[in-house]
């Protein structure tokens, strides 16, 4: 109230924040409009308490902005009279320009002249890295896979797959948090970004891919299909299986 704002904008993506943010927004709603930007309404890895906590938070909002239709659907399931608008996830522009591919391959330690597949970002179960690893094992020898991101928990189950599939010597792992200043290096090496997600709303990774003009293969879950749409910027895999992902990767390079 000391700020005396006309509008308070709050970003929300997981129920962990609902008690604290909901308390603030309910107080502030008495004095100004409260707009919630909803990355997710229900987390990718849900818990029994998500719905009641999110309802508590939403009651403090005057209106909401969702980043895809999938989130809008989740919102209406919890709050049938919700006031909202859909604005797709914006592009990121703070990662700098695309760099020379040869130089970034040298910097990272990649073999030149290969078809580079990129899996980028936090490694969580719902993001389907295991599916991509199995798919990669079916690809010819002129492909290499780049995995750049921090594991959310143990990497053991992924390492077990890597150890048994063909082509493990063509998998480059960088299992750590990627600084903003380093993001350009990874996308500048990529021919194709693959998002083999088991569930999704929208994805910030797709926005980074757009910024660096890297085509994508995504699974048909959540709002990922909306991201690709009819723009000719990638392929929506009809099935989230290793066989389908492998086939779509090869189709991309053959078309």
What are these language model-derived features?
Residues 230-242, 249-255:
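Conserved acidic donor-binding segment of nucleotide-sugar-dependent glycosyltransferases
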Residues 47-48, 76-77, 90-108, 113-114, ...:
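Acidic anion/phosphate-binding donor-loop and adjacent secondary structure
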Residues 158-184:
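Nucleotide-activated donor-binding/catalytic signature segment of Leloir-type glycosyltransferases, i.e.
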Residues 185-202, 211-214:
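Acidic donor-binding loop of glycosyltransferase active sites
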Residues 59-98:
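Donor nucleotide-sugar binding/catalytic pocket of nucleotide-sugar-dependent glycosyltransferases
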Residues 110-127, 133-137, 146:
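Conserved donor-binding/catalytic core segment of Leloir-type glycosyltransferases
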Residues 215-218, 228:
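Short hydrophobic beta-strand element within catalytic cores of glycosyltransferases
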Residues 120, 144-159, 176:
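Glycosyltransferase donor-sugar binding loop
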């Amino acid at each position: 109230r000391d700020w005396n704002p006309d509008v308070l904008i709050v970003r929300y993506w997981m129920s962990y924040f609902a008690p604290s943010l909901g308390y603030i927004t309910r107080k502030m709603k008495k004095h100004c409009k409260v707009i919630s930007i909803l990355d997710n309404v229900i987390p990718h890895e849900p818990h029994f308490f998500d719905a009641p906590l999110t309802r508590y938070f939403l009651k403090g909002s005057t209106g909401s902005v969702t980043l895809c239709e999938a989130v809008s659907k989740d919102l209406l399931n919890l709050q049938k009279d919700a006031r909202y608008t859909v604005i797709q996830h914006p592009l990121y522009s703070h990662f700098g320009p695309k760099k020379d591919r040869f130089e970034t391959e040298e910097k990272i330690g990649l073999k030149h002249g290969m078809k580079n597949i990129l899996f980028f970002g936090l490694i969580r179960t719902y993001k389907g890295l295991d599916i991509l690893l199995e798919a990669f094992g079916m690809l010819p020898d002129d492909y290499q896979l780049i995995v750049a991101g921090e594991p959310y928990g143990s990497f053991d189950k992924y390492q077990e797959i890597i150890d048994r599939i063909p082509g493990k010597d063509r998998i480059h792992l960088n299992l750590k948090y990627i600084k903003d200043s380093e993001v350009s290096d990874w996308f500048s090496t990529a021919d194709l970004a693959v998002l083999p997600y088991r569930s999704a709303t929208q994805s910030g990774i797709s926005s980074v891919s757009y910024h660096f003009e890297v085509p994508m293969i995504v699974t048909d879950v959540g709002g990922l299909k909306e991201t690709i749409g009819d723009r000719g910027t990638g392929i929506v895999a009809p099935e989230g299986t290793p066989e389908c992902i492998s086939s779509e990767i090869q189709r991309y390079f053959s078309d």
